[in-house]
Curated annotation (Swiss-Prot):
Protein species of origin: Buchnera aphidicola subsp. Schizaphis graminum (strain Sg)
UniProt name for this protein: Protein translocase subunit SecY
Taxonomic lineage: Bacteria, Pseudomonadati, Pseudomonadota, Gammaproteobacteria, Enterobacterales
Cited function: The central subunit of the protein translocation channel SecYEG. Consists of two halves formed by TMs 1-5 and 6-10. These two domains form a lateral gate at the front which open onto the bilayer between TMs 2 and 7, and are clamped together by SecE at the back. The channel is closed by both a pore ring composed of hydrophobic SecY resides and a short helix (helix 2A) on the extracellular side of the membrane which forms a plug. The plug probably moves laterally to allow the channel to open. The ring and the pore may move independently.
Principal subcellular localization: membrane
Membrane topology term: Multi-pass membrane protein
């Protein structure tokens, strides 16, 4: 196969060495991340914090703690995790829609992308600062955490805030370093490692339950089959595309006449990714988190009712969760894909869709297809996110992953494999072009 592609041993060795270096860079960066997640902030009693967080099942705190690889429950220097960066990225994307100057910067290509990334970093710093101040100052006010700070003086608060902000900025830099020198999206890989950090212990616990008879062996096998089926569905949907055929009219360049060419515009079914699931979880779990985290008096009938009906296994929670996912899918897809802009670019490049007039009609046609795809994609995300809830409540199965986490894990693995394939294929094409004296 190597000979057919025109590759020699020297080039193959070069690709292998580059791949090894990139994978080594990712591994080293992730080892640093995991070590940092075990370094505690000085002055906090981590035993009290860990005990309180163990009671925060089915809240935003549990989800954020999972994303940080347990760093939040250990009050580590990476307790804030990478969430401020994700939030700032979405905020900047929103601002590019409402602020004309930012919209123009976005269209400037590589230079504009660099500026947008810089604004995202500044916003991350501001968000991390506000979040760290909020967390550190509110810790003693939380029910059961009166003694969590050993010496609650100015020096502690100042040091803790600086450490948390620095930890988040370091993770952001580490993620960008992985993206540049490693393989895949660095931020996604950091979240991925945070999620799977507790997977080995969860697997051992499930196997132990099966061995002791607490979990029937047939039910265990059914769960395994269901998990593999869900993973297959996620891979299938994430790789699926709706291709719109684009034609380019006959054109003349010098003495050469180029005939009509055709290509396609690929539209992913789930263009919004996992962001809608994260936002939907945060919004729906917010009331329970506030009541549980700050110990609001549950004797109040209204608060008691809210706390009960917003539990993850309640019908109201599930209905609101599904509708939130659908809403955020449409909302975020509108941010990342603009049919009118796509139609204008096609018109400028001489492309058109058969039977559709260029310009406004093309934009409406693409938008119509996107609405259908987004609806299907949102229902798919909702289905994936509800499966773990069903397994926990109806089947009484201890499932470590939530639907959001499962989506992130599978999508990141797919992206990682795709990046490796791209690296290998690009090297193969380069070798073929050199051998044919085309490069």
């Amino acid at each position: 196969m190597i000979k057919k592609l025109g590759l020699n041993f020297k080039n193959t060795k070069k690709v292998t060495n580059e791949l090894k270096q990139r994978i080594a860079s990712v591994v080293i960066a992730l080892i640093i991340f995991r070590i940092g997640s075990f370094i505690p902030i000085p002055g906090i009693d981590t035993t009290i914090l860990s005990r309180i967080l163990n009671d925060q099942k089915g809240t935003i705190i549990e989800m954020f703690n999972m994303f940080s690889g347990g760093a939040l429950s250990r009050a580590s220097i990476f307790a804030l995790g990478i969430m401020p960066y994700i939030s700032s990225s979405i905020i900047i994307q929103l601002l590019t829609l409402v602020i004309p100057s930012l919209s123009e910067i976005k269209k400037e290509g590589e230079v504009g992308r660099t500026k947008i990334n810089q604004y995202t970093r500044y916003t991350t710093l501001v968000l991390a600062l506000f979040q760290s101040i909020g967390i550190v100052t509110s810790l003693p006010k939380i029910s059961g955490m009166n003694q969590i700070i050993i010496h609650p003086d100015f020096y502690f608060y100042f040091t803790a805030i600086i450490i948390l902000v620095t930890g988040t900025m370091f993770l952001m830099w580490l993620g960008e370093l992985i993206t540049e020198c490693g393989i895949g999206n660095g931020i996604s890989i950091i979240i991925f490692i945070g999620i799977i950090a507790g997977l080995p212990s969860a697997i051992v616990h499930t196997i132990e339950q099966t061995r002791q008879g607490d979990l029937h062996i047939l039910l265990f096998l059914c769960v395994l089959i269901l998990i593999f089926s869900v993973v297959f569905l996620v891979v299938f949907i994430e790789r699926s595309q709706r291709k719109i055929i684009i034609h380019y009219a006959q054109r003349q360049k010098g003495r050469r006449i180029y005939s009509t060419q055709s290509t396609h515009l690929p539209l992913k079914i789930n263009m919004a990714g996992v962001i809608p699931a994260i936002f939907a979880s945060s919004v729906v779990l917010f009331p329970v988190t506030i009541i549980s985290w700050f110990g609001i008096d549950r004797k109040c009938y209204l608060l008691k009712t809210i706390f009960f009906y917003f539990q993850p296994n309640q019908p109201l929670y599930l209905i609101l969760y599904v509708f939130s996912i659908i809403f955020f899918c449409f909302f975020y897809t509108g941010l990342v894909f603009n049919p009118r802009e796509t139609a204008d670019n096609l018109k400028k490049s001489g492309g058109f869709i058969s039977g559709i007039r260029p310009g406004e009609q093309t934009a409406k046609y693409i938008n119509k297809i996107m609405i259908r795809l987004t609806l299907f994609g949102s229902l798919y995300i909702a289905f994936i996110c509800l499966i773990p809830e069903f397994m926990r409540s109806a089947m009484n199965v201890p499932f470590y992953f939530g639907g959001t986490s499962l989506l992130i894990v599978v999508v990141v693995i797919m992206d990682f494999i795709a990046q490796i394939q791209t690296l290998i294929m690009s090297s193969q094409y380069e070798s073929v072009l050199k051998k044919a004296n085309l490069n």
